[in-house]
A protein has these predicted regions:
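Bacterial Sec-dependent N-terminal signal peptides
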Residues: 1-19
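Flexible, surface-exposed loop regions and adjacent strand-edge segments
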Residues: 184-186, 244-247
């Protein structure tokens, strides 16, 4: 009997050690907005994608839904989350080739250059390239219904593959239709440089926020996580002193500003208190609904964005709220060192970039970045790593590297060894021998970093220009390939 007990103890220890060898959360964050990403995917695309995720040990997928924004993003509302309030249904859609909310002009498939439109098989009556629900919808309600039906199927498919799912949006960013609800004497929002910023102490602002959360819970009842994001552009020029004339928010500011001692100035502390109030609203509302969904805080990783507020939010928020943050500089820089300190108090996830959206016309080798940033997350004792991306084909070596090190914290292959394996598997040993040194050098030195193709702006001929180093290494790659033919 005692031998059997020892056997079970040994087995338990082995299983625990094995679990520690991989991150608890090994995730992906396919980002909606550009047509090169999931905005244009259909259910068959998600099926292939999720199968590939499962094959590579991925156990989490998250989605971010835009609900408006500042400047030209004010009308950028996506239909995975429906914020319907006081019978107002905001306009929303997944973009397609006939919309113009990003840096391209509307174009029907039949007008694509060099008759390339002939390769596309469109649904009956559709003219645009994009998600089938988007290109066949004729009203905002239809856009919402088809998008949410698709994402419910994605949630089901993810769960069938052992993958948990998050749905999220940027708190305090609301569709433009709602700003007309301002009532005299009620401080619903503050005027910023480029948008109106809702006041979380306003009943209207709180109710609109609850409407978004309730829609997630009602539309996706089996959702595993609610992901709340701090807006990329943070606060967009609110006059702090004018805003503090609102007594309810002024009280919250006086009570909590000291938490944000790492913040650079009073404006940053103001954003910290504002974010804290929204996170408290979210946490309490989820509890009141009896939701089992876990709450995640997320945001962008620049110096004036989420990182400067994280320690203050860590001091104030319940420890069962997960913290996440996109790595800085479009992923070129690793996650901050202080995440290790926060990880002693709660679950923390780093978010490396498989690719940056400043170069989505170009090949972006980031095998070394994925290797180094995921290994750093292991050293920091972070609970999870999530990879943001748009495309699937171009960054596939980056993805495989991310998944490899996320699934085995002890992995230690070099960049050259990784490229040799990938190229051997795809093109054979001779090709790998010729091309591994070139791609590994291009990857480590990041010589392509300053080659621009930012899909969030309009196209210019500069997108196709390469400097001498980039021309030279591409010529070497072409010559190496031709020598093998």
């Amino acid at each position: 009997m005692r031998k059997i007990q020892y056997l079970f103890i040994a087995l338990f220890i082995c299983l625990e050690i094995q679990a520690q060898d991989k991150f608890n959360i090994r995730g992906v964050l396919p980002w909606h907005n550009f047509l090169s990403g999931p905005t244009s995917w259909n259910l068959s695309d998600y099926r292939i994608y999720l199968d590939e995720c499962r094959k590579n040990g991925i156990n989490f997928i998250g989605f971010h839904n835009y609900t408006g924004g500042g400047e030209r993003y004010a009308t950028y509302v996506e239909p995975m989350i429906k914020i319907e309030y006081k019978n107002i249904l905001p306009q929303a859609c997944f973009d397609n080739s006939m919309t113009a909310r990003w840096g391209y002009l509307p174009m029907a498939v039949k007008d694509f250059a060099f008759d390339t439109g002939k390769i596309f098989q469109l649904p009956v009556g559709a003219e645009a390239f994009g998600n089938n629900g988007s290109i066949t919808s004729h009203s905002s309600r239809e856009h919402y219904e088809k998008a949410q039906s698709l994402m419910r199927d994605v949630l089901k498919m993810a769960h069938e593959r052992g993958i948990r799912m998050a749905m999220g949006f940027e708190f305090g960013v609301i569709p433009p239709e709602y700003f007309s609800l301002n009532v005299a004497g009620d401080c619903f929002y503050w005027a910023g440089e480029s948008n109106m910023i809702p006041n979380p102490k306003s009943q209207i602002a709180a109710e609109i926020h609850y409407a978004a959360i309730d829609d997630i819970l009602n539309t996706y009842p089996d959702i595993d996580y609610i992901w709340m994001w701090l807006n990329e552009h943070s606060f967009m020029g609110v006059d702090v002193q004018k805003a503090l004339r609102d007594k309810p928010f002024a009280r919250a500011y006086q009570e909590n500003q000291a938490l944000f001692k790492e913040a650079a100035d009073s404006s940053a502390r103001f954003v910290g208190v504002w974010a804290l109030e929204y996170m408290k609203l979210t946490y309490k509302h989820l509890k009141s609904k009896g939701s089992r969904a876990k709450l995640i805080l997320g945001g962008w990783g620049g110096g004036h964005q989420l990182p400067s507020l994280l320690k203050g939010l860590d001091r104030a928020l319940p420890q069962d709220i997960i913290f996440s943050c996109l790595n800085p500089d479009l992923g070129k820089s690793p996650q901050p060192d202080f995440l290790e300190e926060i990880a002693r108090n709660r679950s923390v996830w780093a978010v490396p970039w498989l690719e940056g959206d400043h170069q989505l016309w170009h090949f972006q080798p980031r095998v070394n970045m994925m290797r180094e940033q995921v290994k750093l997350a292991a050293e920091q004792n972070l609970d999870g790593v999530i990879a943001i991306h748009w495309r699937t084909e171009e960054p596939r070596f980056n993805f495989r590297t991310f998944a490899r090190f996320a699934s085995d914290k002890g992995a230690d292959e070099s960049v050259d060894q990784l490229y040799d394996r990938y190229l051997t598997e795809e093109f054979g040993e001779e090709a790998a021998k010729e091309m591994t040194p070139l791609l590994a050098r291009m990857d480590r030195e990041q010589i392509q970093w300053n080659v621009p193709s930012p899909e969030f702006y309009a196209y210019t001929p500069e997108w196709g220009l390469l400097d001498e180093n980039n021309v030279r290494i591409r010529q070497e790659l072409v010559s190496s390939g031709e020598s093998l033919l």
